A protein has these predicted regions:
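Hydrophobic positions on the alpha-helical face of helix-turn-helix-like DNA-binding modules
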Residues: 39-40, 50
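Intrinsically disordered, low-complexity basic tails/linkers immediately adjacent to helix-turn-helix/homeobox/MYB/SANT
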Residues: 68-94
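Short amphipathic alpha helix immediately N-terminal
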Residues: 20-31
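C-terminal flanking helix
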Residues: 58-65
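Short amphipathic alpha-helical boundary/capping segments
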Residues: 9-18
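Helix-turn-helix DNA-binding motif, specifically the short coil turn and the N-cap/start of the second
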Residues: 46-47
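Helix-turn-helix DNA-binding elements, focusing on the entry/boundary residues of the two helices
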Residues: 36
Length: 117
């Protein structure tokens, strides 16, 4: 998973645990694509102050993930669902009659689960 996607997912999962300023600066920098200078100017603080808040926010998000592991579990479930989907597709292709119907139903349920993750 690329670094930007990881940061965004961690923020979505644990962002409420950050301070208000950390949340705000993180969001503005990564989600709104504002530069440190733009944020600093609008907030009336130094670029270094903005960067320190963003860095502390990232560290807090990573520490929280290390302790709780929601993103790791999400990724594991997503990989397992993809593997099950592939196996179910193979099963559908190999079976006929009632077994084929069961395999198709299984594939449909796996796909629904996968899209719900």
């Amino acid at each position: 998973m690329d670094e930007q996607l990881t940061r965004t997912m961690l923020f979505d999962l644990y962002g409420d645990l950050l301070t208000k300023k950390q949340r705000e600066y993180f969001h503005l920098h990564y989600n709104e694509d504002l530069s440190l200078s733009e944020i600093a100017e609008s907030e009336g603080i130094s670029r270094q102050g903005v960067w320190d808040n963003i860095r502390r926010a990232e560290e807090a998000l990573r520490r929280t993930e290390e302790k709780i592991g929601l993103l790791e579990r999400y990724n594991a479930q997503k990989a397992a669902a993809a593997a099950m989907e592939t196996e179910a597709e193979e099963l559908v292709a190999l079976t006929e009659g009632r077994a084929g119907e069961i395999a198709e139903d299984l594939l449909r349920r796996i796909q629904e689960l996968k899209h719900g993750i």
